[in-house]
Amino acid sequence: MSSTTVRPSVNALAAPLVEALVADAAKLRLTVTANSGEARLVNAGATVLGSIEAGRRIAEICLGGLGTVTIAPTGPVAAWPYTITVHSTDPVLACLGSQYAGWSLADEGGTSGFFALGSGPGRAAAAVEHLFEELHYKDNAVQIALVLESASAPPASVVAKVAEAAGVPLEAVTFIYAPTQSLAGSTQVVARVLEVALHKAHSVGFDLAKIVDGIGAAPLSPPHPDFIQAMGRTNDAIIYGGRVQLFVDAEDADAKGLAEALPSTTSRDHGAPFAEIFARFNGDFYAIDSHLFSPAEVVVTSVRTGHSHRSGRLVPDLVERSFA
């Protein structure tokens, strides 16, 4: 990607979505804490019920205003018909430059034990991850939003760290947080079905500049009060029920190679519900083969030739086993 290309501000595009979420907090069953001189905190499921609609909107915020997220009663997994569909005309920036949960945030030196992965457009304002050097992108934002998969609000040390890294005052930061066990939390995680395909494309070395459009769909997983089960269901929705189509400005050989490299079937750990795999590795997330974190089925279409290349397969039985 050219460093001279004018790119949109993901925080500016997401800002009206954030304000709409805050304005509709009551009907979405969220709470908002906003004190003068402090960051704004949106509780979307930690100590409130939240909602699926809140999760859908949070997913669009995570995409930096560069994508749409819809929920409809159609999809490839018949037993669980409600499907989350994600589309972006700038999938690299939307998914990797904004939605990807790549910012590790911890209460360093504190006693809270807080840790969460930050996602959303605020990442691009801080640009502390090496990924942004590869993307040649940094968002010079005046207001930022960050989404945390967390059961608690970030402590003061994390709030200060984020504001400082992004170069904005505390009151210009909005944190939206919800655990995976919640309605909103599970919804926004499944809405990463397109993002995991982009992350996999990056990890296998495909030229990201050649990815020009993308769409993904996965079944809406029911929430579960247990974190491991909830995490398992959201992963299984994508790993065994997710379908993605990428449109690439590349020749067939490259498109075919990408299609063959992307799906979760390339992983040695494919074939069991994620919670069972997690237990098999004694809860060591990083011991699991990283190739597993991919959509079940992938279609890569070359816009140069018009040919499409398909790889992987849906496994509805494992989705059913996980969701039941």
Swiss-Prot record:
Pathway: One-carbon metabolism; formaldehyde degradation; formate from formaldehyde (H(4)MPT route): step 3/5. The keyword Cytoplasm applies. Its EC number is 3.5.4.27. It is found in: Cytoplasm. GO terms for biological process: formaldehyde catabolic process; one-carbon metabolic process. SUPFAM superfamilies: Methenyltetrahydromethanopterin cyclohydrolase. It holds the Pfam family MCH. Gene3D superfamilies: Methenyltetrahydromethanopterin Cyclohydrolase, Chain A, domain 1 (3.10.340.11), Methenyltetrahydromethanopterin Cyclohydrolase, Chain A, domain 2 (3.30.1030.10). GO terms for cellular component: cytoplasm. HAMAP family: McH (MF_00486). This is Methenyltetrahydromethanopterin cyclohydrolase. It comes from Methylobacterium nodulans (strain LMG 21967 / CNCM I-2342 / ORS 2060).
